[in-house]
UniProtKB/Swiss-Prot annotation:
This is Uncharacterized protein MJ0284. GO terms for molecular function: transferase activity. It comes from the Archaea. Pfam families: PrmA (PF06325).
Length: 219
């Protein structure tokens, strides 16, 4: 397996959003945070399936494949993001299935058709959803879908929503096993940004679907 610093550099070399849209809260995750999350999650997704909901330019999906996911699927509603993601995967010679579609249309039938003989593998959702700053409750749409299709979920959220997410997931029948705090680096890309760079405190949750038992002790 490659070193985390090497993965960080590889991901940071990839194309960012070519035309980020504020209403979709499109922020490209920096290489360090992406690498940290992927190394945190690798025991879950190694030789299994990764589904990146709202994949943007594909950093999490591509990184997971580099670290040994058997299959990686990226879903995004924005066609420009998907085209950039495909370019990024090609640049690193990584095989990822990218689809331009609404995440609400992703279901077991779709995934079974995409995965074929790999349909019975563990499905790990790794997502960087919108925080809901531009569209209220946008984060809930992603949480609901992740809990529907994923066996294990890694999801990034704005730190002030930590208590809400914990209660929301538990009410939906999910089990939060690990919480990881970090900073999300955001450069000035929209007109309403006043500073060149800000670091937003975020929290990453590892969630198990009710009835799914992990088969290893997380370190």
């Amino acid at each position: 397996m490659i070193k985390k610093k090497h993965l960080e550099m590889m991901l940071d070399s990839l194309k960012r959003h070519p035309n980020p849209k504020a209403d979709l809260e499109q922020y490209t995750i920096d290489g360090k945070l992406a690498a940290d999350i992927l190394f945190f999650a690798v025991n879950d997704f190694y030789n299994n399936v990764v589904i990146d909901l709202g994949c943007g330019t594909g950093r999490l999906a591509i990184g997971s494949k580099i670290l040994g996911a058997k299959r990686a699927i990226g879903i995004d509603i924005d066609r420009e993001s998907i085209e950039a993601a495909k370019e990024n995967a090609k640049k690193l010679n990584v095989d990822v299935d990218f689809y331009c579609m609404d995440i609400r249309d992703v279901d077991d039938e779709f995934l079974n058709n995409v995965l074929g003989e790999d349909r019975d593998l563990k499905r790990v959702v790794i997502q960087n959803p919108p925080f809901g700053a531009q569209k209220k409750h946008a984060d809930r749409v992603f949480l609901d879908k992740a809990l529907e299709i994923g066996d294990i979920i890694y999801t990034i959220h704005n730190y002030p929503t930590k208590d809400f997410v914990i209660k929301y997931v538990e009410d939906k029948g999910g089990k939060i096993t690990h919480i990881y705090e970090a900073f999300f680096r955001i450069p000035a890309i929209y007109e309403f940004h006043k500073k060149k760079v800000v670091e937003i405190p975020v929290v990453i949750f590892r969630i198990e679907k009710l009835g799914f038992e992990t088969v290893f002790n997380f370190l």
